[in-house]
From Swiss-Prot:
This is Calmodulin-binding transcription activator 5. Residues 887-914 form a coiled coil. It is found in: Nucleus. The gene is CAMTA5. The keyword DNA-binding applies. Residues 272-372 are annotated as: Transcription activation. One of its GO terms (cellular component) is nucleus. Transcription activator. Binds to the DNA consensus sequence 5'-[ACG]CGCG[GTC]-3'. Regulates transcriptional activity in response to calcium signals. Binds calmodulin in a calcium-dependent manner. Involved in response to cold. Contributes together with CAMTA3 to the positive regulation of the cold-induced expression of DREB1A/CBF3, DREB1B/CBF1 and DREB1C/CBF2. GO terms for molecular function: calmodulin binding; DNA-binding transcription factor activity; double-stranded DNA binding; sequence-specific DNA binding; transcription coregulator activity. Signal peptide: none annotated. Its main location: nucleus. SMART domains: ANK (SM00248), CG-1 (SM01076), IQ (SM00015).
Length: 923
C-alpha cells in the first residue's frame, strides 16, 4: 500500500479520520499482525483507496499481517492466493461466513472470512462497502489468530461504548495517566463470576485485544457496578501468576515490578495496584501513603475534565484505543530507569495529541544534579528518517538560571549534536539531518554532553508513502547524482589554464573585471572558517560536514575557474566527455549558488552544450524548480529552442522538456514565461506596441483572504489569460508583418512584370485546379470501381452458395432413388414386424429438411465517419494539451510553488545586486 503523506480523507464524518496522519497507516500495518482492523479504519481505507496501491494480480501465499487492496471489477480471482482454505460439503466451494459491520449506527461494510484447511488458526477476511458506487474495491486481511472458527473480533460498531459479550468476567478499572480525555464514562463494569485459572491466559488475551471503546460503559453513574475487594484481589493474583509474553499490547504492564497509578473514577477511591515485596500481593489501597508510595507522587485526576466533554468528542480522540494505550505504557516502562514509585519520575503526555504521533515521555536521570531547562513541548514529535526536519523546542528556565534565557544551546538527539538557535524566550530551533528509523532520546545541553533538561523520546519514522516524480529508486538516483558531481569536479580541475594565463598578456579591462569578481567572492573565506569552527565544536554530523566540504571545494574551484575565464576574455568552450559544460552540470545538480557567480563574471547563462541545450533546458528536464527560478531571475531566456532531432524536427523549449518528464506545473510556468519573453523580444524589436494587460491586472490584484486552493486556481486562470493574450498578440504581429511585406512587394514591383507574374500565377492556379479535379475524379473512379468489384464478388459468392446447396440436394435425391429397391424389399418386413411390435409407422424414406438460407450481413465501411472520428480525436487531444493544468490540482500546486520560488529568487537576486552596487559605489 502506498500513497501520499497528507491529504483530506473522504467520509471523515462517518469514520472520524480527517487526514492520513490521523489514520496512522504505519501503526496500522505494524499492528495488523496482532489485531483485526476496526470498522472505521476499514471504512476509511476503502473510501480513500485512491491514496493506496491497487494490486492488479493476486498475491501468492501471503503471510500473517498482510493487507492488500483489489478491484473486483478488474480482478475476479483475487481470492486465489495459493492457500488451502476450508471447503463446503461439496469439496469445491470455499466455506466463507458473511456478516455486515456497522460504522456509527448503520451497516456499511461486507465481511467474508475463511479459515485455513491445514492451519485452522490462519484466517482471511475480505471487506468491501455496501455502497454500490464503491463496492468494487476489496480489502483483504490475512492473520494468524488464536481462535478456531471464531466470529470476527472486530466490533460491529466502532463507536460503541458497551462491553461486548466476549469480555472476560474479571476486569480491573484502568485508564491512561495522561491528559487525554479518552474516558468518556466513569468506570468499568466488574463482574463477580469466578472462572478457573486454566483459562486465564485466554481471557487476559481477549481483554488486551479488545478495542478501547469496547471497554467503555454508558455514562450513567447511578447504575454503575462498583468493583468489590474480592474481584480486585482475584485479578491482582492472576496478574502476578500470568507468564511474561502471554499477553500482547498490554503485557509489559502485568510483568512490571512496580506500582501503577490508576486514575480515580466516581465510586472508586483511588485504587493503586502494588506489586512489590513491601506489600502483600494483590492488595489495594485508597491512600498513596500505603505500600511505600510517596504521597507527593504527581498524578492527574480526570473526573472533572471527563464530564465536561461530550462522548463523541472523547471517542474521536486520537488516543481512544487500547493499542495506543499499550504503546504508551510500553514506552513508559522501557524508558524508565528506575521504579515507578520513584518521586523523580514524571510521565507527561500532551493532551489532544494525534494517534499518529508517538507517545512522548519525559523522565529525569539520577546522574543529572539539577534541571536547568524544563521542556514543555517539542514540535513535531517525530520526523521522517529520509528528510531534514526543523524542530521547535519550547520550555522555560528555572528561576535561578534566567540569565541563560538568550543563549544558544545544543540539541542532543541520539548520537547527533546540532546547534539549537534561540528564537525567543523559551523557544529554540534546530535542524535534524536524515537518520535511520527508530526512537531516540532528545534533550538540550550547554556543552554537548551534560543534559540540562529532561529527556524526550523522539521518533525517526521510515517513509511509507513517497510522492516524488523521480522514476528511479533512491539508490540509483544517488548514484546518478554522484556521477554528475564527479563529472563537474573533473571538468573544473582538468580544464585549468593557469600557465597560459600567467604567460599571456592580460588586458587592463579583463584584469579589472577579475579583481571585481575576486572582491565579490571574498565571502567564501568566511565559509571555510565557519565550517572549521562547526567541526571543531562537533556541532554538525559527519555526513553533513562532508557534504559541506565537497560543496565548498566546488565553490572555490568554480570561483578560480571563472577568474581564469574572465582573464581569457570569457572563453568558456570546455565540455566534458558527454558534451556538457560547467553551467549545465551545475543546473543538473541544482547548485543555485553557481548562478550568482556566473552573473558576477558576466558569462552568458544561455551558453549551449553540444546538443544545443542551455542550463535552463537541463534544469527543466530534471525538474529542478529552484534552479529554474534562479536562472529566470538572473536573466536566462526561456524561449530558446534546442537543436532539431529526429523525434522533434523543430527543436524543444524548456517547457517541452519539462512536460516530457511529467512536470506539468513547471512546464506550464515555463510556457507562460516563454510566451511573455517572446512578446517582450518582439516589443523591443519594434514589431509589437503596447504591453500585456493581464500582467498589469495581475500586479494590481490583491490576493485577499483566499485559501491555498483558491489562490492556486486564481494563479492558473491568470497564467492562462496571460498566455492567451501573448499568443494572440504575437500571432497578430506575424499577420501584420506578412501584410507589410506583401504591400511593399506590390508597391515596388513594375506593372509589366507584375502582369506577367499575375498571368503566370493564374496559369499555375488553373493547371493546379485542373490537376486537383482530375485527381479527385480518378480517386472517385477507383473507389467506385473497387466498390462495384466488391459488390459483384459478393453477389457471385452468394449465388455460388445457393448453387452448391441445390447440387447437394439433387445428389441426395439421386442417391435416395437408387435405394428405392432396397426400401421396397424391406417393406414387407417393416409392415409385418415393426408395425406389429413397435405399433408405429414404418420407414417411409428420408425426409430432407430444407436448410434456412441466411444472407450474409452487409458490412459497408463508412469512410467518411471514420475520418470524422479521427479528426474529432485530434481536436480533443489539442484541447487536452491546452487545458492540462485546469484538470490537475497537482499541476496547479506545482505552478504556484514554482511562481513563489521565482518571486523569492528574484527578490534575492535583486537584493544581492543592490548590495553589490552599494559596495561598488563606496569603493
Amino acid at each position: 500500500m502506498a500513497g501520499v503523506d497528507s491529504g483530506k480523507l473522504i467520509g471523515s464524518e462517518i469514520h472520524g479520520f480527517h487526514t492520513l496522519q490521523d489514520l496512522d497507516i504505519q501503526t496500522m500495518l505494524d499492528e495488523a499482525y496482532s489485531r483485526w482492523l476496526r470498522p472505521n479504519e476499514i471504512h476509511a481505507l476503502l473510501c480513500n483507496h485512491k491514496f493506496f496501491t491497487i494490486n492488479v494480480k493476486p498475491v501468492n501465499l501471503p503471510k500473517s499481517g498482510t493487507i492488500v487492496l483489489f478491484d473486483r471489477k478488474m480482478l475476479r480471482n483475487f481470492r486465489k492466493d495459493g492457500h488451502n482454505w476450508k471447503k463446503k460439503k461439496d469439496g469445491k466451494t470455499i466455506k466463507e461466513a458473511h456478516e455486515h459491520l456497522k460504522v456509527g449506527n448503520e451497516e456499511r461494510i461486507h465481511v467474508y472470512y475463511a479459515h485455513g484447511e491445514d492451519t485452522p488458526t490462519f484466517v482471511r477476511r475480505c471487506y468491501w462497502l455496501l455502497d454500490k458506487s464503491q463496492e468494487h474495491i476489496v480489502l483483504v486481511h490475512y492473520r494468524e489468530t488464536h481462535e478456531v472458527h471464531a466470529a470476527p473480533a472486530t466490533p460491529g460498531n466502532s463507536y460503541s461504548s458497551s462491553i461486548t459479550d466476549h469480555l472476560s468476567p474479571k476486569i480491573v478499572a484502568e485508564d491512561t495517566s495522561s491528559g487525554v480525555h479518552n474516558t468518556c464514562n466513569t468506570g468499568f463494569e466488574v463482574r463477580s463470576n469466578s472462572l478457573g485459572s486454566r483459562n486465564h491466559e485466554i481471557r487476559l488475551h481477549e481483554i488486551n485485544t479488545l478495542d478501547w471503546d469496547e471497554l467503555l460503559v454508558p455514562a450513567d453513574i447511578s447504575n454503575q457496578s462498583h468493583p468489590t475487594e474480592e474481584d480486585m484481589l482475584y485479578f491482582t493474583e492472576q496478574l502476578q501468576t500470568a507468564p511474561r509474553g502471554s499477553v500482547k499490547q498490554g503485557n509489559h504492564l502485568a510483568g512490571y515490578n512496580g506500582s501503577v497509578d490508576i486514575p480515580s473514577f466516581p465510586g472508586l477511591e483511588d485504587p493503586v495496584y502494588q506489586n512489590n515485596n513491601s506489600c502483600g500481593a494483590g492488595e489495594f489501597s485508597s491512600q498513596h501513603s500505603h505500600c511505600g508510595v510517596d504521597p507527593n507522587l504527581q498524578r492527574r485526576d480526570f473526573s472533572a475534565t471527563v464530564t465536561d466533554q461530550p462522548g463523541d468528542a472523547l471517542l474521536n480522540n486520537g488516543y481512544g484505543s487500547q493499542d495506543s494505550f499499550g504503546r504508551w505504557v510500553n514506552n513508559f516502562i522501557s524508558d524508565s530507569p528506575g521504579s515507578v514509585d520513584d518521586p523523580s519520575l514524571e510521565a507527561v503526555y500532551t493532551p489532544g495529541q494525534d494517534s499518529s504521533t508517538p507517545p512522548t515521555v519525559f523522565h529525569s536521570h539520577s546522574d543529572i544534579p539539577e534541571q536547568v531547562f524544563n521542556i514543555t513541548d517539542v514540535s513535531p514529535a517525530w520526523a521522517y528518517s529520509t528528510e531534514k526536519t526543523k524542530i521547535l523546542v519550547t520550555g522555560f528556565f528555572h528561576d535561578s538560571f534566567q540569565h541563560l534565557g538568550r543563549s544558544n544551546l545544543i540539541c542532543i538527539c541520539g548520537e547527533l549534536r546540532v546547534p539549537a538557535e534561540f528564537l525567543q524566550m523559551g523557544v529554540y530551533r534546530c535542524f535534524l539531518p536524515p537518520q535511520s528509523p527508530g526512537v531516540v532520546n532528545l534533550y538540550l545541553s550547554v556543552d554537548g554532553n551534560k543534559p540540562i533538561s529532561q529527556l524526550f523520546s523522539f521518533e525517526h519514522r521510515s517513509v511509507q508513502f513517497i510522492e516524488k516524480a523521480i522514476p528511479q529508486d533512491d539508490q540509483l538516483y544517488k548514484w546518478e547524482e554522484f556521477e554528475f558531481q564527479v563529472r563537474l569536479a573533473h571538468l573544473l580541475f582538468t580544464s585549468s589554464n593557469k600557465i597560459s594565463v600567467l604567460t599571456s598578456k592580460i588586458s587592463p579591462e579583463n584584469l579589472l573585471e577579475a579583481k571585481k569578481l575576486a572582491s565579490r567572492t571574498s565571502h567564501l573565506l568566511n565559509s571555510w572558517a565557519y565550517l572549521m569552527k562547526s567541526i571543531q565544536a562537533n556541532e554538525v554530523p559527519f555526513d553533513q560536514a562532508r557534504d559541506h566540504l565537497f560543496e565548498l571545494t566546488l565553490k572555490n574551484r568554480l570561483k578560480e575557474w571563472l577568474l581564469e575565464k574572465v582573464i581569457e576574455n570569457r572563453n568558456t568552450k570546455e565540455y566534458d566527455s558527454k558534451g556538457l559544460g560547467v553551467i549545465h552540470l551545475c543546473a543538473v545538480l541544482g547548485y543555485t549558488w553557481s548562478i550568482l557567480l556566473f552573473s558576477w563574471a558576466n558569462i552568458s547563462l544561455d551558453f549551449r552544450d553540444k546538443q544545443g541545450w542551455t542550463a535552463l533546458h537541463w534544469a527543466a528536464y530534471y525538474g529542478r524548480e529552484k534552479m529554474v527560478a534562479a536562472l529566470l531571475s538572473a536573466g536566462a531566456r526561456p524561449n530558446l529552442v534546442t537543436d532539431p532531432t529526429k523525434e522533434f524536427l523543430g527543436g524543444c523549449t524548456a517547457a517541452d522538456l519539462a512536460q516530457q518528464k511529467g512536470y506539468d506545473g513547471l512546464a506550464a510556468f515555463l510556457a507562460e514565461k516563454c510566451l511573455v519573453a517572446q512578446f517582450k523580444d518582439m516589443q523591443t524589436a519594434g514589431n509589437i506596441s503596447g504591453n500585456l494587460e493581464t500582467i498589469k491586472a495581475e500586479k494590481s490584484s490583491n490576493p485577499g483572504n483566499a485559501n491555498e486552493e483558491e489562490q492556486s486556481l486564481k494563479d492558473t486562470l491568470a497564467a492562462y489569460r496571460t498566455a492567451a493574450e501573448a499568443a494572440a498578440r504575437i500571432q497578430g504581429a506575424f499577420r501584420e508583418h506578412e501584410l507589410k511585406v506583401r504591400s511593399s512587394a506590390v508597391r515596388f514591383a513594375s506593372k509589366e512584370e507584375e502582369a506577367k507574374n499575375i498571368i503566370a500565377a493564374m496559369k499555375i492556379q488553373h493547371a493546379f485546379r485542373n490537376f486537383e479535379v482530375r485527381r479527385k475524379i480518378a480517386a472517385a473512379a477507383r473507389i467506385q470501381y473497387r466498390f462495384q468489384t466488391w459488390k459483384m464478388r459478393r453477389e457471385f459468392l452468394n449465388m455460388r452458395k445457393k448453387a452448391i446447396r441445390i447440387q447437394a440436394a439433387f445428389r441426395g435425391f439421386q442417391v435416395r432413388r437408387q435405394y428405392q429397391k432396397i426400401t421396397w424389399s424391406v417393406g414387407v418386413l417393416e409392415k409385418a414386424i415393426l408395425r406389429w411390435r413397435l405399433k408405429r409407422k414404418g420407414f417411409r424414406g428420408l425426409q430432407v429438411s430444407q436448410p434456412d438460407e441466411k444472407e450474409g450481413s452487409e458490412a459497408v465501411e463508412d469512410f467518411y465517419k471514420t475520418s470524422q472520428k479521427q479528426a474529432e480525436e485530434r481536436l480533443e487531444r489539442s484541447v487536452v494539451k491546452v487545458q492540462a493544468m485546469f484538470r490537475s490540482k497537482k499541476a496547479q500546486q506545482d505552478y504556484r510553488r514554482m511562481k513563489l520560488a521565482h518571486e523569492e529568487a528574484q527578490l534575492e537576486y535583486d537584493g544581492m545586486q543592490e548590495l553589490d552596487q552599494m559596495a561598488t559605489e563606496e569603493s
